Amino acid sequence: MKRFLALVALVATLVGCAKPVEPAQKFDKFNSVVYEMNIRQATEEGTFAAAEKYLPELKAMGVDIVWLMPVSPIGVDGRKGTLGSYYSIIDYKAINPEFGTMDDFKHFLATAHDLGLKVILDWVANHTSRDANWWKEGKTDWYVMDEKTGLPIVEYDWTDIAKLNYKNQDMRAAMLDALKFWIELGVDGYRCDVAMNVPADFWKGAWEEVRKINPEVYLLAEGEEPWLHECGFEATYAWELHHIFNAMAKGGSETKNVAGDGTIKTDAKTVKDLKEYMARDDEKYPAPAMRLMFTSNHDENSWAGTEFERMGDAHKAFAALTFVMPKSQPLIYTGQEIALNRRLQFFEKDSVKELVDLEYGKEYRDFYRALCSFRHANKALAAGENVAPAQFVEGVADSVLAFTRTKEDNTVLCLFNFSVEPVKVTLNEAEAGDYMCACGEAKSFKPGDVVELPAWGFMLLSK
């Protein structure tokens, strides 16, 4: 019986081996990789001009879409910290002077487009700052008011924002006008903050109008509600999946049942839970829906912790999985490509100074470059109308997630060990064949061959 040893993590086998795939002439949103850029923290200067210099590195990494966190001026009333929250906006049509000028933004956008990158803006349609221009202009009926205080209501603990009133048609018209403004400027789409808190009929009508300007506009919703896809969004957040990742990595924590019946409750998750999630997700989100999958983003990094805190030694395996699951649209957050193990401050300046040193964090830069390359090289991994389903490998250990995905003449074989112990995977006739590993090495398997996966190890192959 022939045996194959998979190295501890994909990066151990593919660093320096995989070559970036040349981008197609036409943008393929269904096989794209998103990079969330935190302009404030991405460089020491925290400006568009400084961040623009990093765009060629993102292109070389294999990024397709650059999502910019909000770029508009930030409110002062109720401001959190020194610099405030990006999501507390004064003027939807203006640029935060902290980042530069409108001309600086246009230059950033032009450079991105010259490189073949798409740029989407983080759009906050649910609320403005408490001192926004609309409020100062006396448009109080544009807001949801608190009868007791006579001021706009506060949602959650967001004491620096004012909830907008979507029953007001004038406010809706102004919001649509602002959305169209940036598309006419050349922006390629939006990531919409707390999209599920904005009425469905507004989104549907707005996107119909926006697509008259640019039919190829790309739309990502922060929310998991399936109805968001019916309103025109291509992609939604896979939050539930992310929390399953965290729980699988930590192994869960046990607590006694509060009813006192002696049973134990646990938040631990296993591969079984992951497979059940995949089945639910497939049913809830019919193709061509895409699901944004991630191990970090601005919320998780600042408030829940880095992927190293939450996932420990499992972080690379889960990152790799986001690139190969059905309907996935993988996300990389600022600093992940250099293994940044620090919670970035949200309301203060906290630069990722090492990012511009292209020799720094080379192991992780190459790791993500190889994942992007593998994604782009295999049409079986693309989302879209004819998304290839996962066919699970039979007879594997409970800790193993093993599946193939096939589209036309292209098949990928993905093997993951989600445990702290090494495991052996015996391949069946269905998985036999000649493959190319994501590391660039050729591998041939016969029925009965065994692949050895170390703790949290994985292997990605294609033919």
Regions found by a protein language model. Name each.
Residues 193-287, 291, 321-324, 339-374, ...:
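Active-site-proximal helices and loops of the catalytic beta/alpha 8
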Residues 391-428:
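Carbohydrate-binding surface patches
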Residues 20-64, 70-185, 205-214, 218, ...:
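Substrate-binding/active-site clefts of carbohydrate-active enzymes
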Residues 67-81, 122-131, 193-199, 222-226, ...:
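Short, solvent-exposed turn/loop segments enriched in Gly/Ser/Thr/Pro and often Arg
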Residues 446-463:
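C-terminal beta-strand-rich structural cap/linker in extracellular carbohydrate-active enzymes
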